[in-house]
Amino acid sequence: MDLTLIPEFKLRLWENIMNLNVKDAASCKYDMISLGEIMLRLDPGEGRIKTARSFRAWEGGGEYNVARGLRRCFGMRTAAVTALADNEVGRLVEDFMLEGGVDTSLIKWVPYDGIGRTVRNGLNFTERGFGIRGALGVSDRGNTAVSKLKPGDIDWEHIFGELGVRWFHTGGIFAALSETTAEVVIEAVKTAKKYGTIVSYDLNYRPSLWKDIGGKEKAQEVNKKIAKYVDVMIGNEEDFTACLGFEVEGNDANLKKLNIDGYCKMLSEVVKVYPNFKAI
């Protein structure tokens, strides 16, 4: 392993992190806002989804969980930008959000047609693992209100320019929901940067979300456009490979022997291609 690569890489990232000019709290209504889908999570406890007769309900979403965690753990002023069908399920999700202390004023409420033909709310069944049995997640999120968001639906000028936001977080799950959600991300990050808001993005590659809309090729097309506006990029080596096209050299096919130098070199290449990344 070439140890000379690690100090150089760490130094470059540390210098960039120190240059994260987060806006003054007094000038902003929110410390952080998220953009993404928030689903009703149904948990069968110790049981199996396919045999359960009762579920415990929660709310959750890859991007939203960051806002909730910052509010509950650190008392930060957070809000979630999302869309929900205006029915009892949507209002239940809102109630969970309120319980978590997250501001719900930025939710876009979409009229419900009574059966979900035009719009609905997402469900996520989550089964915990036990022993050698792996955990299982089953998402029912097609045709959801948030997947229908398109550029112009959210007043980003008002959010970033008038209300003020110190940190904006979104990710690859939301970007993969539809052609238009990717466009909404780009619209949002451009406006965030215009007003000096720090942008973080979780690549969070999910093959199931991309496979029917172009797979890795589409994921890279979308994420490369977004990456140009990101300050803090989050992901593992699989995310950087699938979403941004970088490769780790020297690993065997089964990943039984890992080439640490290869990971360092890949990350060094990442910061060369995207000098705007201040932290990875």
Place the predicted regions along the sequence by residue.
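Short, Lys/Arg-enriched N-terminal segments with co-localized hydrophobic residues
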Residues: L3-I17
